[in-house]
Curated annotation (Swiss-Prot):
Belongs to the DEFL family. One of its GO terms (cellular component) is extracellular region. This is Defensin-like protein 289. Its main location: secreted. The keyword Glycosyltransferase does not apply. It comes from Arabidopsis thaliana. Disulfide bonds join C33-C50, C39-C55, C43-C57, C72-C92, C78-C98, C84-C100. The lineage of its organism: Eukaryota, Viridiplantae, Streptophyta, Embryophyta, Tracheophyta. The keyword Signal applies. GO terms for biological process: defense response to fungus; killing of cells of another organism. It is found in: Secreted. Keywords: Antimicrobial, Disulfide bond, Fungicide, Plant defense, Secreted, Signal. Residues 1-29 form the signal peptide.
Length: 103
């Protein structure tokens, strides 16, 4: 009798655990939307849009352009920071290459 109760209890716990697991991950993976306003709230971005029932968050896309390795000895050997992202500048690091770093 005790083994039957233990078996039923274990099956019940496994069922509840699996149900909770599925519900948690379904909510996190759900990117569906009906209005753009839902996406603005979900993405925390005014430029977010609901396109074909899915949220598109533009700030999550990052465009990184490859740069050529520029050899240097000091920061003065590096080019102007216009090739770096906004508020970054070139610095000569220990490996002797110019690298964009944030201020």
């Amino acid at each position: 009798m005790a083994t039957l109760k233990t078996t039923i209890f274990i099956i019940f716990i496994l069922y509840i655990s699996c149900t909770m697991f599925v519900n948690i991950f379904r909510v996190q993976a759900d990117a569906s939307c009906l209005t753009t306003k839902e996406c603005v709230v979900r993405c925390s971005d005014e430029d977010a849009q609901c396109i074909h029932g899915e949220c598109h968050c533009p700030h999550l896309k990052v465009d990184i352009e490859p740069t050529k390795a520029i050899r240097c000895k000091t920061d003065l050997d590096c080019p102007d920071p216009h090739q770096c992202p906004k508020y970054d500048y070139y610095a000569c690091l220990n490996n002797g290459e110019c690298t964009c770093i944030s201020v």
